[in-house]
From Swiss-Prot:
This is Transposase for insertion sequence element IS1201. NCBIfam families: transpos_IS256. One of its GO terms (biological process) is DNA transposition. The lineage of its organism: Bacteria, Bacillati, Bacillota, Bacilli, Lactobacillales. It comes from Lactobacillus helveticus. PANTHER family: MUTATOR FAMILY TRANSPOSASE, TRANSPOSASE FOR INSERTION SEQUENCE ELEMENT IS1081. Disulfide bonds: none annotated. Required for the transposition of the insertion element. The keyword RNA-binding does not apply. Belongs to the transposase mutator family.
Length: 369
């Protein structure tokens, strides 16, 4: 009679003891099977000399609790150094895996690196994911992002903000590339990222393609576009949305002015220029703007001359109700979204491919409210 048989015999009159005994035996058996599985995968026993210099080795284990009819058992799932071993003794715990994979995608969208996610998941849940596995899980979002780029758009938006931000991307060499972004507000006040695209730098040809794509997907009518001073934007808008009005971002205009004047004049110029968007009506704003011309023309003739050239685009927001003017004289709304992207991108240092960047931005865009 072996030890197991003796223990069973002693426990026969106590159901709890039998369950506890069977639970312990099952736990040991499963752990032995898992270790045998890894040995077969590696091709050598623990500490064996024939395992030297094979390119792979044992790398500890992670713990997993499994429900059985005899109670919970604690399993030590062995790991290999290269992260290639996948055990077949235990079935995948699908519900738990789904929770973890959703957590991985959420952490990825927050800008946490794949290595940090792998470490965090193991510490929190005792489940081992290599950085490569984390990256593969995040790739599950690729079809959703592709569908997002192709989705049917609403036919009307009251206002559309256009702006580009720069994100580090590797294409053989490391460069900062432009992410073109369009955020819209519908007549009911709902906000959404309409679409975005990635290109090496900002130019009007890419903006034109993005605008044409938006129209081809159903966006027929826009009341107002807001953008900075990228050359050719008004022309591109006139071709695609000829009925739309255009407001140049006053914050960008002010920054450009301050970059072209003396340091000692910047504070006064900035404070006076801000008065333009704080008036009760358009007529009062025109008076303030013309007073600004008169005061600074002698010192900065080239700046004032350029400002006069774009005057028709500076005060368009006054044509709309006072309650919404604060939201439509600048592209601050889209810049807030850009800042979120930059903050989340920072820990990643750079994106290895355009697709990885597209997926990351897509997750941000789809969760934008």
């Amino acid at each position: 009679m072996n030890d197991f048989t003796k223990n069973i015999a002693q426990a026969l009159f106590n159901q709890d003891k039998i369950n506890d005994l069977l639970r312990k035996e099952l736990q040991q058996a499963v752990n032995d099977l898992l270790e045998a599985e890894l040995t077969a995968f590696l091709g050598y026993n623990p500490y064996a000399r024939d395992g030297w210099n094979t390119g792979n080795s044992r790398n500890g284990a992670y713990f997993r609790k499994v429900d059985t009819q005899f109670g919970k058992i604690e399993i030590q799932v062995p790991r290999d150094r290269n992260g290639l071993f996948h055990q077949h003794t235990l079935p995948d715990y699908k519900q738990h895996s789904d929770v973890l994979e959703n957590m991985i995608i959420k952490l990825y969208s927050k800008g946490v690196t794949t290595r940090e996610i792998a470490d965090l998941i193991e510490k929190m849940y005792g489940s081992h994911y290599s950085p490569a596995q984390v990256s593969n899980i995040s790739k599950q979002m690729i079809p959703k992002v592709e569908a997002y780029h192709k989705r049917k758009l609403s036919d009307k938006f009251f206002c559309v903000y256009l702006d580009a931000t720069y994100v580090p991307l590797r294409r053989e060499t490391f460069e900062r590339e432009a992410v073109y972004i369009a955020i819209g507000i519908k007549p009911n006040g709902h906000k959404e990222v309409i679409d975005y695209c990635i290109a090496p730098n900002e130019n009007i040809e890419v903006w034109t393609e993005l605008l044409q794509s938006m129209k081809s997907r159903g966006l027929e009518q826009v009341e107002l576009f807001l953008s900075d001073g990228v050359v050719g934007m008004k022309t591109a808008l006139a071709k695609t949305y000829p009925q739309a009005h255009f407001q140049r971002c006053l914050v960008h205009v002010m920054r450009n002015i301050c970059a072209k004047v003396r340091v000692e004049d910047r504070e006064a110029i900035m404070n006076e220029f801000k008065q333009i968007h704080q008036q009760a009506n358009k007529a009062a704003a025109v008076d303030v703007l013309h007073a600004f011309y008169a005061k600074w023309d002698k010192s900065y003739n080239h700046v004032i001359r350029n400002l006069k050239d774009i005057e028709p685009d500076l005060l368009v927001f006054y044509n709309y109700p006072k309650q919404i003017r604060a939201s439509i004289y600048s592209t601050n709304m889209i810049e807030s979204f850009n800042n979120v992207i930059k903050r989340k991108v920072k820990p990643k240092a750079e994106f290895p491919t355009e697709q990885s960047l597209d997926t990351f931005i897509g997750i941000q865009a789809m969760s934008y409210q």
